Design a protein with these regions (language model features):
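Charged, low-complexity intrinsically disordered terminal segments
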Residues: 2-175, 184-519
């Protein structure tokens, strides 16, 4: 009897394994990509954006130079997106990792919808991380406007029971499109670290991210569009219609009313006492920067490669630029997990006498504890190496502070940028962690501009002097956090600030888990 029971259990286990492997093979074969040819790109020369800013573009030092200007503070970055959509006459291409179902997301979608009403061709490419339970209204939206297309990158197919599919298709379903870009009429592009959501624009949200965005115009915009089309036509994106059913009339009407009501409520708030970048550039009140800009990005096929043999074009490009540092490297990284390989790169720079400064999140400002736990294992080695290490304080939301490029009342760092020798600049979606290097697809822009790099570098140094803990090795080589105070003095913490005793016990246990390669 016992032998029979064991045989039955063994048969059940083998059957389950065979079913699991069979389902995995079937799904992955079904989802094998079938790329389309990329179309030729064109510029909407009848666009007001082209007519109004041609003179500024014509002032570039060479045809290879692009115009650029940083977007700050937080709400201005959302307002510029809205006003760009308002002026569109030809095309809008938007690519985001997250497009939240909140006020900022509603405002953004309403701006796109208004453009679609005018006949603008809209293409919205979003990752599946933020689509679940909204497929129905998005399907109705594109049904209402044939010139509004939505595609979803690397979608799950079992929409209501994602966890079993996640297990079957791991690690592919854990690999996401982290790219972020927004292009209007082929004239202007915005790229940087921001997704679309309240926390990225300080809009009715207790959590506010400090981040970078830059507005670009010129030849680099065509590179951004090529990146967009590479993903759009990769065969790894699915039309929104294939992922669900259209919402009924009542539900769709309620949703559309929510979009328009939110837009009408918040637009006056966004515009109050704010001078937009584009009109200010046109009037000559602010001066644009010019640089030869290189747009870099991972192939969408990266999600098909083995995580143990990653093919990351972004990692190679980023490492190549960092490796050119001769005097100074400044890194702003929301999630900083350098890995053994990254530590070797930084050690090589320090051996050459390069000053390295890193700004990342503290425990109190980090929104992912397991990431902080992994990062915490690198702090002492970095300090021993001579790296200047700063951790952002989680800011008092009601403090009265001056605005800076990173924002004044931010509770968490989300920026992904670095600056080499106060001359070379990188901005994009790439975090200094294994998830960006191995798992997700990423994009960014690299350019040289000494004046801009010096300005931003100095702003960041001024920012950390008042808004971040400076880490030191104190007595017995123990970590200390120097907290800047308003009177210019420092308070020294010998224990990690804003952490309970329970959390202090948990942190090394979490750090011990073998999950760094997933973070």
């Amino acid at each position: 009897m016992l032998t029979l029971l064991i045989n039955l259990l063994l048969l059940l286990a083998l059957s389950s394994l065979a079913s699991f492997l069979g389902l995995r093979v079937w799904i992955n074969r079904k989802l094998r990509p079938n790329p389309e040819d990329l179309p030729k790109l064109s510029i909407s020369k009848d666009s007001p954006l082209y007519k109004n800013f041609y003179d500024l573009l014509d002032q570039a030092p060479s045809p290879e130079h692009s115009l650029f200007y940083p977007l700050s503070p937080l709400q201005d970055a959302l307002l510029e997106r809205i006003k760009l959509a308002d002026q569109a006459v030809g095309t809008i291409e938007a690519q985001y990792y997250m497009l939240n179902d909140d006020e900022a997301g509603n405002i953004f979608l309403q701006a796109l919808t208004d453009a679609a009403k005018r006949g603008v061709q809209i293409r919205l490419l979003i990752d599946d991380i933020d689509v679940i339970q909204r497929e129905d209204v998005l399907i109705r939206l594109v049904d209402e406007f044939p010139n509004f297309q939505i595609r979803v990158f690397n979608p799950a197919w079992l929409r209501l029971i994602r966890k079993p599919e996640f297990l079957v298709r791991f690690p592919r379903l854990s690999r996401r499109m982290h790219n972020k870009s927004y292009t209007i009429d082929g004239i202007f592009s915005i790229i940087g670290g921001r997704n679309i959501g309240n926390e990225y624009f300080d809009l009715k949200h207790e959590l506010t991210f400090a981040d970078f965005d830059i507005l670009f115009a010129g030849p680099m915009v065509q590179e951004v569009r090529t990146e967009f089309d590479t993903y759009w036509y990769s065969g790894l994106c699915s039309d929104i219609h294939t992922l669900g059913h259209a919402a009924d009339d009542e539900h769709y009407a309620e949703w559309r009313n929510k979009l328009s009501t939110t837009y009408a409520q918040y637009l006056p708030i966004l515009m109050k006492d704010r001078d937009q970048v584009l009109p200010a550039l046109k009037r000559g009140e602010i001066q644009p920067y010019y640089a030869v800009v290189k747009v870099i990005y991972d192939s969408p096929d990266k999600i098909l490669t083995s995580v143990f043999k990653p093919d990351s074009l972004m990692l190679n490009e980023v490492e190549g630029v960092i490796g050119t540092a001769q005097q100074e490297l400044l890194i702003c990284a929301a999630y900083f997990i350098p890995s053994k390989h990254g530590m070797k790169v930084l050690k090589g720079l320090r051996d050459r006498g390069v000053k390295i400064t890193v700004l990342t999140n503290s425990f109190e400002s980090n929104d992912v504890m397991v990431v902080h736990a992994s990062y915490s294992t690198y702090r002492k080695p970095l300090l021993k190496m001579g790296v200047n290490l700063y951790e952002l304080k989680s800011h008092d939301r009601h403090a009265d502070n001056e605005h800076s490029l990173l924002g004044s009342e931010c509770t968490s760092l989300h920026a992904k940028a670095f600056f080499v020798d106060r001359r070379k600049n990188f901005i994009g979606s790439f975090n200094m962690d294994p998830r960006s290097a191995i798992h997700n697809t990423e994009m960014g822009a690299i350019f040289e501009h000494q004046g801009y790099a010096e300005m931003v570098t100095q702003e960041i140094y001024d920012f950390v002097d008042s808004q971040a803990y400076k880490l030191k090795l104190g007595k017995h080589r123990r970590l200390e956090w120097q907290e800047p105070l308003k009177d210019g003095s420092y308070r020294v913490h010998t224990k990690e600030p804003k952490m309970t005793e329970r959390q202090r016990l948990l942190l090394p246990l979490i750090a011990w888990l073998p999950v760094e390669w997933l973070l």
